[in-house]
């Protein structure tokens, strides 16, 4: 559903000149799921999950390619790191989290996934959010958000995948900035500046 929406909404524009498609629909749906949570808290929940989906999709694409070449290489962490792909342990892969999205312990599973990814990827140590198990976070909402994010294809070929991730992050940050009562320019760097 999200993939089809991207093509249908190509004509809408955001404030930075980027095409709006699935980002707006994704944010509207995700925003409804947040309940009474403050946008400043919710952004970490949503963006952390989107990043997790992105690295898991990249890992799975590389894993599939390596399996076709050499099954033994597919289990070698260095094969992924050599291609600038994060190693994602089995318990941290999106497919595992999606399969368990409706479980009452989904918050703990996500926190454990983030810890496992940090453990196996030095550059991510201490960076990923690990507070999905907190009691104040509605686990039903969290499971629904996982299902929603599962519809985003973040494993496109080459730079297109990074562009999709960037579009989602940029749009979400702009929306969160507005929800927090700040002008978007005070909250994140616009696309035009990033390219400079």
Where are the regions that the model predicts?
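Non-catalytic, mostly N-terminal accessory regions of nucleic-acid modification and defense proteins
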Residues: 1-196
